[in-house]
Amino acid sequence: MAGRLDEDLKDVTLLGNQNTKYLFEYSPEILEVFDNNHPNRDYFVKFNCPEFTSLCPKTGQPDFATIYISYIPEQRMVESKSLKLYLFSFRNHGDFHEDCMNVIMNDLIKLMDPRYIEVWGKFTPRGGISIDPYCNYGRPGTKYEKMADYRMMNHDLYPEKIDNR
């Protein structure tokens, strides 16, 4: 099987670029996509992002999380280095945990139009409480909409112990 041709990757500009510029403000425009070579089948793509940081909008204190992003692609897929830089752009962004996860999901839906996507943030405790917002989306009118409902109802049936962070 042949790999991808350079012309297939013309819109992927950050991967392999030695002059990467790190943005310090929320920057959804940095996200890049490439074509899904297997749109005829369902499969999950999962990103584990253990170095997410943002700021509390009230106190300005830093918040830290591992974010899990899973999606079933349609025609387009997010390029991982652009995703890394996008997530890094939240470093000085002041928003609540729940808002950050929904913003990330909405930006990825707008970018890729996936069949299904879920974003789960597992934030480290602050003040003795950890917050783990989960959001998902299934394309309306399809089996993925039903899948989203099912996964939402069952996403956290077995709460974890806090010692796993």
Curated annotation (Swiss-Prot):
Subcellular location: Cytoplasm
Position of the signal peptide: none
Tree of life domain: Bacteria
Pathway annotation: tRNA modification; tRNA-queuosine biosynthesis
Record flagged with keyword Cytoplasm: yes
Family, similarity comment: Belongs to the GTP cyclohydrolase I family. QueF type 1 subfamily.
Function: Catalyzes the NADPH-dependent reduction of 7-cyano-7-deazaguanine (preQ0) to 7-aminomethyl-7-deazaguanine (preQ1).
Name of this chain's protein: NADPH-dependent 7-cyano-7-deazaguanine reductase
Organism: Bacillus mycoides (strain KBAB4) (Bacillus weihenstephanensis)
